[in-house]
């Protein structure tokens, strides 16, 4: 075991066995923007052995205040986010397998991309993609972590098919375009992005190490500006969920 992880190995919560599990695990990151770049950075530095980054966008100047893997040179090169991120991450740890996928996640490709992964982490900025991820992960039995951040606050919730409520257990309908604030309408605090993504990865590492007993298992809500942290119990109600109870995969089916 390389001494790269020496300080992490000292943690009772991880240790040598936990590190071996991380080194042998595979993660998919959906989106390589504010959340996604922090997620990727933390996964690679933690020693997750294979990281797949899915994003079709190119880097723009207004990304740089929060998307930590990118710089002005990447903009001059005209690189896609997934490719630029992969180049940076390989320089951080050349032993990690980094696979950039320059594409949107769609009903036509998502199952092929995430098949065989141990976890999917949410770095997206829209609920249509999240509903798609939720359906694909429930269908294939892959844990995933929902996360979102806007303005100064964000939330994280770990979803383990067959054990926890899924996303559509508590968000039944796709929110309308004007129902929720977005980073384009109200902005976003870079430090809030870092905090939410770091909590998301921490929960993800627990899953990858088989430490589900340590999962918070609540919807975590953090406001970085106010300095507040809350956790809300999410329970399945009496109404059966169309996805995890009825196994109806409307978003997967409509795009095929």
What are these regions (language model features)?
Residues 1-256:
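Adenine nucleotide-associated cytosolic modules
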């Amino acid at each position: 075991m390389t001494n790269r992880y020496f300080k992490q190995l000292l943690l009772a919560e991880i240790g040598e066995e936990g590190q071996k599990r991380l080194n042998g695990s595979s993660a998919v990151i959906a989106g390589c923007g504010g959340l996604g770049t922090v997620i990727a950075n933390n996964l690679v530095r933690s020693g997750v052995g294979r990281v797949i980054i899915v994003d079709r966008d190119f880097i723009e100047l207004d990304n740089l205040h929060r998307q930590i893997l990118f710089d002005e040179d990447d903009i001059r090169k005209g690189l896609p986010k997934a490719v630029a991120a992969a180049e940076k991450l390989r320089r951080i740890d050349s032993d990690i397998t980094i696979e950039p996928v320059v594409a949107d996640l769609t009903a036509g490709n998502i199952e092929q991309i995430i098949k065989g992964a141990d976890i999917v982490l949410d770095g997206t900025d829209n609920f249509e993609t999240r509903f798609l991820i939720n359906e694909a992960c429930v269908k294939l039995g892959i844990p995933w972590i929902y996360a979102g951040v806007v303005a100064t606050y964000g939330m994280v919730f770990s979803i383990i098919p067959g054990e926890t409520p899924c996303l559509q257990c508590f968000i039944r309908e796709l929110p309308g375009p004007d129902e929720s604030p977005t980073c384009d309408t109200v902005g976003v605090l870079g430090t809030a992005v870092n905090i939410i993504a770091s909590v998301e990865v921490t929960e993800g590492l627990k899953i990858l190490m088989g430490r589900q007993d340590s999962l918070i298992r609540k919807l975590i809500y953090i406001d970085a500006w106010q300095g507040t942290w809350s956790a809300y119990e999410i329970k399945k109600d009496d109404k059966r969920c169309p996805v995890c109870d009825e196994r109806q995969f409307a978003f997967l089916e409509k795009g095929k």
